[in-house]
Amino acid sequence: MRIAVPIWQGKISPVLDAASRLLVIDLEDQKESSRFEIYLDEQDLSRRCFRIQGLGVNTLICGAVSRPFMRMLNASGIEIIPGISGPTEDVLRTYLHGSLHHSGFTMPGFKGPRVKGGDS
């Protein structure tokens, strides 16, 4: 499984659409096996989506994301976990323990999880 997290100054980037760096983590048996970082220099959302899809990302954990970009990513088969904020390593550790939605990492004002297949 491959997850990705947009990062900024050691934290989850506040807005996926404008993020310039993406941390990509490979998981085997719910444990990290490798990681690498890429720069997202594509400004066009469809190109940005194509780039993320080309990385083989299964799940993307992010802060805010526009509805059009979320729909593009969902249509590409990528599960989106939006509305998350906090230090990157803490968020990843909590995700790997399966308790991300029950943690204190939800962005202020976020109305609830909108995951793959969501229409909101």
Write out the residue ranges for each language-model feature.
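Conserved short alpha-helix immediately C-terminal to the canonical SAM/SAH-binding motif I
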Residues: 69
